[in-house]
């Protein structure tokens, strides 16, 4: 086998490191990491040294006389295992330790080499005598094979040469024992084959295997079945690949042996452990049996739990689709859609139908009606999430273990280089480990000529077509000429795009393209969506912004050397998606090579920089939350960069037509040649024993694509194919099912085959077979984008909501609702409006590609991943501008994410949808469509009640709301707090009004937008590429919000000090002013007595009384005069004890309470949006709650007034609230913010549960208006409650107001209060109690059902508290 190649791949210094590089250039050293199998050597023991030698020549003991049933091996065949070379022959020079590169830099090795277990000694055998003079355990190391999990044996013997071991930084990579030799000639290591007991057969396996788990061991019955199956006559291919049992027994002759294959014995072929994936062997005799016996011989796999049983469609043309229930609006992949798992849409829009097809259609209709009747009672089942179904099938512990197994790094090796690559150190260029040979260069030229330039040649052969220009094109041209220099208020081409942009004209223009493949197949044009241009921004706006694929801090990358693997400058990552739903298909792309099947499992990504400190990429597609993992692994070496680029252009440009996916960046398109930021390699693998993988070399993939590039139905064979038996034709059609075929020059060029039909419409004319493709019409062209349907749908939803909240529903209203529902159903059933379409194409001109839909499914995840990685790399540039490095990178991304942003495809969304519909899997499994708005929806009274009824989490919980409004809510409180504190200390003589004026000037959005511009946040913000933020005023407002979110993120992860430093640096550019702002003086009372002023208590009766309050609350103030000033009312004049009253402290205390309450709500209420959090905070930090807490603490008894009589005075609610806020400020000044947190944890936050259960977060006036709006009549202005003042009595300083509230001309409530506002609140509360509002009753029932036990406990506590004073009075009596 390829021992020498893999030997060099694995252990050349500078090439055997985790990414397969290590040579030139300044590169940070790998972090210190110590594998678990290292063992400390004795201090006096010298470090072990190892010497690896290439495999020895075949032993003469291997002779043809001993194996008469086998052909003699070819000269380059290496037996397993080879004996040690005799000293007379002279061993080959050992593998060089250091490549002969100039200025080659080695990575730092570990202090001691790893202790690997030595190879067990070979068993005695007459054909394999032990080599004399060879130390035990010494041998070659041709492959990267992990060591068995065994106890550590004694250390290996000392060898004359030392090797530097290098380990990947991210995970432990296991290596084989130094003495492991995969080519030892030990014929007795394995039992003889069943075919010839006297013939020794050899397996390329480790000399000892890992112990298997109990549940993985094959039972005797299964082993017997496995052996029986091995001797059956199952072919592995068609045509010349068909091999009978007789041929398998006699082996392959040397002259018929393929030069690129490696000779393997029948024992080896038959007993190779089955792969972890499905083994898709093709058979011409037993079509159904092959799947059955594959299931029996397949080994346990972690992907099996996610796979569904493969259901054949038989000979039927198509299966009926489920009818769409009313109100269901399916959309394209990544949007809301509703499909079934195994039903396909019926063919429609067919011009010519044969009689047999009409009979089939009648059967389809019957099955459709029968299926719809059976499903009528279970509409909601279709909305069940795929993740929930899988959670029921698979236990949670098992799912977690399987996902860990999926993400666990594996040891890999490449298939043979076959003279396409050279790994000779003398041939290397720069820091490569593999260089392409002239044979590989010829292969690249052939691939580029036959496949790479095929599309361009076909387009050039067609006559050019100039599309007619629309008014939008003229506006864009005029906008680019003027550069928008005169338009300061807008960054869009027009202020009213809806008036200028004619969507219908744009769609007609795309439909009129002469090269269009079919009317119902939509294609991609650069910079265009299905209904017009992707970007309608001005030329000035296109020069910046993430939405234009311009990532700050990106620089052009020097091109890689095309004919080498550039191992020293590329970093390799394996890409995998979890969960694997919709990515593991029943028809994967399989490449047969050397009697093995290599199954497509995803892509490898090569980056030019290490992907450190980049979080996982999460995206919603098919209504399922996916996570894209990029796992660092050992680099597969047999590839060259030019081969990767040829494949990428073939797949992404010619097949998928992703024209708007730019991996270089628009800024570098016209610059000198530069390299793409990422290279991609398809991974075709087969599983090896002990959990390893063999990756197919890149040249074999290109050869496979060249072999597959043949006509789908050759013109010269049409007549022959039409004469095939039905079974033979059905098998060919099944093989083509799911295949991607291409018609060069058409739009779109490639499509997936769902059915292949050879029925002839005209018996006199032979026609090509028909390709049937089941596609999805774009949303803009189906009922989902129809303005009439949208208008009718909105009116239907509004009427349904009104009837649900109406106390009495009229029969006419019910009929009106039913009529609208029926009208919606009719629109959905129109052929021109259906989402599912059936496309029929002639197979003439179509070519096979060898690619199936699973490759396209994985490929469409790559734009999302590359956008995610590039964005997080540019955020590192933002870290430098901020002066703070975030540890939680997702938190920084969240701060930059505007609510309008949605990460769907990472590029032009219509391009991705079209490519998925044309080339993706036919019927993806969809999750619950609610996943899109489950945590994002915040409109509607029902959503408000649902969210506001949720109690807080006991432990801090991360939020699932993926935009920055919540962080903006927190950052706003932080900015207000910092501003208030600094102004309070810097201006000790300024009154509350002046402080509030200065604070308003600092925290207003216009000023915060200026600070955001200093950080260039507009270049980093993520927001929708549309008209939302086109106007400069809207963009400035969004930038101010983004700045507040950034301050909140810094405060949340860093500290208050970090947020203070950042805010100070941005406020003042002058270092002196910044120093004044940041280093403010102490409070005047603290400056008078720097240490403490408690010595004044003895001489001051006022302070003596305050010590009682200190004992009551358990806090001893260092400067007790601060507490005295907090309790000094405004009516008290200036005195030397307090130096003023408490109005300034009230200003500071309000900001402190806002910050502490905001942080608590942000952490413990993760499902609440900004508006919901504001409602909760308003219920906590208001005069009523504050006055209640102050009264419970008895603060009114310690209030310092100018009343000489010292009589107890009943303070107003506002005065009590001011006392509490002033106390909070004094507590912060004397202690710190931690004391305030503790105080509010005890006195305020426990009240939240009562506020939520009683719905006290909603004031009576707002609640009454909400209830009245639910009773509005359709087509009329909604009736709202009106308040009228009926009476005003009392003097001017103590008046009482009487207010009544009217609804629809009827008085429904009345209230009294010391102010008009309080009287209106009383009137609204009275109306809610007396008037029978259905919405109010619904809210009460909702809370009662949800928190029945909590409400009982709360009522019991309230009754207990009310009885306590009465019991105390009875005891006194």
UniProtKB/Swiss-Prot annotation:
The record marks 1214 as: Important for activity. Mg(2+) 1 binds at residues 968, 1041, 1044. Zn(2+) 2 binds at residues 560, 608, 675, 679. SUPFAM superfamilies: dsRNA-binding domain-like, RNase III domain-like. It is found in: Nucleus; Nucleus, Nucleolus; Cytoplasm. Pfam families: dsrm (PF00035), Ribonucleas_3_3 (PF14622), Ribonuclease_3 (PF00636). Residues 70-99, 119-133, 144-159 have a biased composition (Pro residues). Residues 474-490 have a biased composition (Acidic residues). Residues 389-1364 are annotated as: Necessary for interaction with DGCR8 and pri-miRNA processing activity. GO terms for molecular function: DEAD/H-box RNA helicase binding; lipopolysaccharide binding; metal ion binding; primary miRNA binding; protein homodimerization activity; R-SMAD binding; ribonuclease III activity; RNA endonuclease activity. It is an enzyme of class 3 (hydrolase). Zn(2+) 1 binds at residues 535, 537, 548, 1025. Residues 47-69, 160-169, 185-200 have a biased composition (Low complexity). Its EC number is 3.1.26.3. Residues 214-271, 278-288, 297-312, 363-398, 447-459 have a biased composition (Basic and acidic residues). It comes from the Eukaryota. Component of the microprocessor complex, or pri-miRNA processing protein complex, which is composed of DROSHA and DGCR8. The microprocessor complex is a heterotrimer; each of the two DROSHA RNase III domains binds one DGCR8 (via C-terminal region). Interacts with SP1 and SNIP1. Interacts with SRRT/ARS2. Interacts with CPSF3 and ISY1; this interaction is in an RNA dependent manner. Interacts with PUS10; interaction promotes pri-miRNAs processing. This is Ribonuclease 3.
């Amino acid at each position: 086998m390829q021992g020498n190649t893999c030997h060099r791949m694995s252990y050349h210094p500078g090439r055997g490191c985790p990414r397969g590089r290590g040579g030139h250039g300044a590169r940070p050293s790998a972090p210190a990491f110590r594998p678990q199998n290292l063992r400390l050597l004795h201090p006096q023991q010298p470090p072990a040294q190892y010497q690896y030698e290439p495999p020895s020549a075949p032993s003469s003991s291997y002779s043809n006389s001993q194996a008469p049933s086998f052909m003699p091996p070819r000269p380059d065949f290496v037996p397993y295992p080879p004996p040690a070379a005799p000293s007379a022959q002279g061993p080959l020079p050992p593998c060089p330790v250091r490549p002969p590169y100039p200025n080659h830099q080695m990575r730092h090795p570990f202090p001691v080499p790893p202790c690997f277990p030595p190879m067990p000694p070979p068993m005695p055998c007459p054909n394999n005598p032990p080599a004399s003079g060879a130390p035990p355990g010494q041998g070659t190391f041709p492959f990267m094979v992990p060591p068995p999990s065994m106890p550590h044996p004694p250390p290996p013997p000392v060898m004359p040469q030392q090797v530097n071991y290098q380990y990947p930084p991210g995970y432990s990579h296991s290596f084989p024992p130094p003495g492991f030799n995969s080519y030892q000639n030990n014929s007795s290591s394995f039992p003889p084959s069943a075919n010839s007991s006297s013939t020794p057969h050899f397996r390329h396996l480790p000399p000892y295997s890992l112990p298997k788990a109990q549940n993985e061991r094959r039972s005797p019955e299964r082993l017997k079945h496995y052996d029986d199956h091995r001797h059956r006559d199952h072919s592995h291919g068609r045509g010349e690949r068909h091999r009978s049992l007789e041929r398998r027994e006699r082996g392959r002759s040397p002259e018929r042996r393929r030069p690129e294959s490696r000779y393997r014995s029948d024992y080896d072929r038959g007993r190779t452990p089955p792969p972890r994936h499905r083994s898709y062997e093709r058979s011409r005799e037993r079509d159904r049996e092959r799947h059955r016996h594959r299931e029996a011989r397949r080994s346990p796999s972690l992907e099996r739990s996610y796979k569904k049983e493969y259901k054949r469609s038989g000979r039927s043309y198509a299966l009926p689709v489920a009818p769409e229930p009313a109100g269901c609006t399916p959309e394209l992949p990544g949007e809301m859609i509703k499909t079934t798992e195994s039903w396909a849409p019926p063919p429609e829009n067919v011009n010519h139908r044969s009689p047999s097809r009409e009979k089939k259609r009648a059967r389809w209709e019957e099955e459709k009606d029968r299926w719809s009747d059976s499903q009528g009672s279970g509409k909601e089942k279709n909305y069940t999430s795929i993740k929930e179904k899988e959670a029921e099938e698979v236990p949670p512990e098992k799912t977690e273990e399987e996902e860990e197994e999926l993400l666990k790094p594996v040891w890999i090796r490449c298939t043979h280089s076959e003279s396409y690559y050279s790994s000779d150190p003398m041939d290397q260029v720069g820091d490569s480990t593999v260089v392409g040979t002239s044979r590989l260069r010829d292969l690249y030229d052939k691939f580029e000529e036959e496949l790479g330039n095929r599309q361009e040649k076909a387009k050039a052969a067609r006559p050019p077509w100039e599309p007619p220009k629309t008014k939008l094109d003229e506006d864009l041209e005029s906008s680019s000429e003027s550069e928008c220099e005169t338009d300061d208020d807008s960054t869009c081409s027009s202020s009213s795009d809806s008036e200028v942009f004619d969507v219908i004209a744009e769609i007609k223009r795309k439909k009129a393209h002469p090269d269009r493949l079919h009317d119902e197949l939509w294609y991609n044009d650069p910079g265009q969506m299905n209904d017009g241009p992707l970007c309608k921004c001005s030329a000035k706006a296109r020069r910046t912004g993430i939405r234009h694929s311009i990532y700050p801090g990106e620089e052009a990358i020097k091109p890689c050397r095309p004919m080498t693997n550039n191992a020293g400058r590329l970093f390799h990552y394996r890409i995998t998606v979890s969960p694997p739903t919709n990515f593991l298909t029943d028809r994967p792309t399989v490449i047969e090579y050397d009697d093995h099947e290599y199954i497509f499992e995803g892509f490898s990504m090569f980056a030019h920089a290490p992907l450190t400190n980049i979080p996982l990429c999460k995206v919603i597609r098919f209504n399922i939350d996916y996570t894209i993992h990029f796992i660092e692994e050992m680099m597969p070496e047999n590839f060259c960069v030019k081969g990767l680029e040829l494949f990428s252009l073939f797949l992404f440009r010619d097949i998928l037509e992703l024209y708007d996916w730019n991996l270089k960046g628009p800024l570098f398109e016209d610059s000198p040649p530069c390299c793409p930021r990422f290279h991609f390699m398809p991974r075709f693998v087969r599983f090896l024993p002990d959990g390893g993988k063999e990756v197919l070399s890149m040249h074999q993939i290109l050869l496979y694509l060249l072999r597959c590039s043949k006509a789908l139905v050759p013109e010269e064979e049409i007549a022959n194919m039409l004469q095939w038996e039905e079974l033979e034709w059905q098998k060919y059609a099944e093989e083509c099912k799911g295949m991607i075929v291409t018609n060069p020059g058409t739009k779109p060029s490639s499509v997936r085959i769902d059915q292949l039909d050879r029925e002839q419409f005209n018996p006199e004319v032979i026609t090509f077979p028909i390709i049937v493709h089941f596609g999805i019409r774009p949303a803009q062209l189906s009922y989902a984008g129809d303005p009439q349907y949208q208008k009718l749908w909105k009116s239907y939803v509004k009427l349904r909501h009104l009837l649900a909240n109406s106390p009495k529903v009229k029969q006419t209203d019910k009929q009106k609702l039913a009529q609208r529902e029926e009208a919606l159903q009719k629109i959905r059933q129109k052929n021109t409006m259906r989402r599912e379409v059936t496309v029929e194409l002639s197979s003439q001109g179509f070519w096979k590609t060898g690619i199936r839909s699973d490759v396209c499914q994985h490929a469409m995840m790559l734009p999302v991943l590359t956008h995610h990685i590039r964005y997080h790399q540019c955020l590192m540039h933002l870290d430098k501008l901020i002066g703070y490095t975030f540890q939680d990178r997702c938190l920084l991304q969240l701060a930059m994410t505007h609510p309008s942003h949605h990460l769907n495809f990472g590029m032009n969304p219509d391009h991705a949808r079209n490519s998925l519909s044309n080339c993706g899997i036919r019927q993806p499994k969809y999750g619950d469509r609610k996943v899109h708005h489950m945590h994002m929806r915040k409109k509607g009274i029902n959503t408000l009640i649902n969210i506001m009824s949720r109690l807080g989490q006991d432990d801090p919980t991360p939020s699932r709301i993926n935009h920055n409004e919540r962080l903006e809510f927190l950052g706003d409180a932080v900015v207000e707090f910092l501003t208030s504190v600094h102004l309070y200390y810097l201006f000790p003589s300024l009154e509350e009004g002046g402080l509030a004026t200065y604070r308003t000037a600092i925290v207003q959005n216009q000023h915060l937008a200026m600070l955001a511009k200093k950080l260039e946040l507009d270049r980093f913000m993520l927001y929708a590429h549309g008209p939302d933020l086109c106007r400069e005023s809207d963009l400035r407002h969004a930038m101010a919000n983004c700045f507040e979110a950034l301050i909140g993120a810094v405060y949340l992860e860093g500290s208050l000090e970090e947020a203070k430093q950042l805010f100070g640096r941005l406020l003042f550019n002058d270092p002196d002013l910044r120093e004044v702002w940041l280093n403010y003086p102490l409070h005047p009372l603290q400056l008078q007595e720097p240490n403490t002023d408690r010595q004044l208590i003895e001489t001051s009766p006022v302070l003596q009384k305050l010590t009682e309050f200190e004992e009551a609350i358990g806090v001893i103030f260092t400067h007790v005069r601060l507490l005295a000033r907090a309790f000094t009312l405004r009516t008290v004049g200036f005195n030397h004890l307090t130096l003023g009253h408490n109005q300034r402290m009230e200003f500071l205390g309000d900001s402190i309470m806002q910050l502490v309450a905001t942080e608590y709500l942000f952490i413990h209420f993760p499902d609440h949006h900004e508006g919901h959090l504001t409602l909760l905070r308003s219920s906590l930090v208001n005069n009523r709650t504050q006055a209640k807490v102050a009264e419970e603490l008895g603060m009114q008894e310690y209030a310092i007034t100018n009343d000489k009589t010292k009589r107890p005075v009943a303070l107003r609610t506002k005065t009590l609230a001011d006392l509490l806020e002033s106390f909070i400020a004094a507590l912060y000044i004397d202690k710190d913010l931690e004391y305030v947190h503790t105080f509010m944890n005890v006195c305020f936050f426990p009240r939240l549960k009562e506020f939520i259960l009683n719905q006290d977060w909603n004031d009576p006036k707002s609640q009454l208006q909400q209830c009245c709006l639910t009773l509005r009549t359709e087509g009329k202005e909604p009736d709202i409650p009106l308040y009228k003042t009926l009476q005003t009595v009392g003097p001017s300083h103590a008046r009482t107001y009487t207010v009544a509230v009217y609804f629809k001309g009827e008085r429904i409530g009345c209230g009294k209060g010391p102010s008009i506002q309080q009287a209106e609140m009383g009137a609204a509360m009275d109306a809610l109690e007396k008037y029978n509002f259905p919405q109010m009753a619904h809210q009460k029932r909702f809370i009662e059902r949800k928190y029945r036990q909590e409400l009982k406990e709360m009522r019991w506590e309230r009754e207990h508290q009310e009885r306590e004073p009465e019991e105390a009075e009875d005891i006194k009596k």
